[in-house]
């Protein structure tokens, strides 16, 4: 067997795509290895959402090339950098053999064969008329991912936020048919999944076909929840514009749906939200939060924030801080604005100085960290259900699981009893990024 090494950068959709690529090349005689030096085929599945994420690719390529012992190794750059930069990847890293975009994954086996025969550069960054999900063989879907699994139900974006490359790298919004998703969910559960996270760039924009009808995300979740041995359902990433009635109601009514929503807002300033083309206001966003909390009092939230978008003033930034204070997030992710080539935001003349972005980011992260620690501390003394996988902790006999709120929970498991199980855990101690407890 030949060695396959895959390194994944970025979002959960990339993790899912890497699983698809692994499954689609295995029939060519590849088995996964843990080190690029042992590999005959190296795939770097990339992220282009920020400049730093893209530059990680070229750093890793340089490292692999400098330590390359196998002269027959095939190097593939996949994902959003591949889609956005195309031939530029070959210019910056001429030793790369294949560049393949996210929508061209079904062509990967053919590209590998072509590259081995031609010994030249091979590229496919097409947006085919037939969605990639419809072109991949059935055996690519539903294989074991352990006790927690990803399932892509929607891909692409029609929102065209002015800071974002996703519409250009992932294409227009596409929703997979209901029956196809349900079949994959059944297979995942059959192969050990107790939790499924439904994925999409705008997952709550889902509008999949089922026997002549169009289903939204709320209806899909209710349907998937009928799978008997499935115990937890999550979804990510959602957009405030796509919240709809059945999604609100399924949060209130379906116990398998976790009480945790990742709902990116990006800014608390209406002026900046308008400049970002978000097409919602801070007040509308807060209204969504309030309604979900009324329907499901134990629900908690995470979000994404961009600091220093062009034109952001101190007043605009303070409005973001006020929104964070109002919501009180369980966790949140924050980044300095990174101009992406080809996006309207990158063309603006009123870019915020780097030192101002850095200072604001530190202030925001301090507030977010404070809220996260307070939320974690609020769990002390409570007993919560924790899903464990095979992830080990820093200490001997320690295993790590996930709370309903995506917190890492560490417990001692000397007899290896908790792997792939949901266990009630009493929380004894809270840290910034984790909880410590014991089986109740």
Swiss-Prot record:
Residues 2-117 form the MTTase N-terminal domain. One of its GO terms (molecular function) is 4 iron, 4 sulfur cluster binding. [4Fe-4S] cluster 1 binds at residues 11, 47, 80. It is an enzyme of class 2 (transferase). The keyword S-adenosyl-L-methionine applies. The keyword Ribonucleoprotein does not apply. Its cofactor is [4Fe-4S] cluster. Pfam families: Radical_SAM, TRAM, UPF0004. Keywords: 4Fe-4S, Cytoplasm, Iron, Iron-sulfur, Metal-binding, S-adenosyl-L-methionine, Transferase, tRNA processing. Its EC number is 2.8.4.3. [4Fe-4S] cluster 2 binds at residues 157, 161, 164. Its main location: cytoplasm. It is found in: Cytoplasm. Gene3D superfamilies: Methylthiotransferase, N-terminal domain, tm_1862 like domain. GO terms for cellular component: cytosol. Binds 2 [4Fe-4S] clusters. One cluster is coordinated with 3 cysteines and an exchangeable S-adenosyl-L-methionine. Residues 143-374 form the Radical SAM core domain. It catalyses: N(6)-dimethylallyladenosine(37) in tRNA + (sulfur carrier)-SH + AH2 + 2 S-adenosyl-L-methionine = 2-methylsulfanyl-N(6)-dimethylallyladenosine(37) in tRNA + (sulfur carrier)-H + 5'-deoxyadenosine + L-methionine + A + S-adenosyl-L-homocysteine + 2 H(+). Catalyzes the methylthiolation of N6-(dimethylallyl)adenosine (i(6)A), leading to the formation of 2-methylthio-N6-(dimethylallyl)adenosine (ms(2)i(6)A) at position 37 in tRNAs that read codons beginning with uridine. Monomer. Belongs to the methylthiotransferase family. MiaB subfamily. This is tRNA-2-methylthio-N(6)-dimethylallyladenosine synthase.
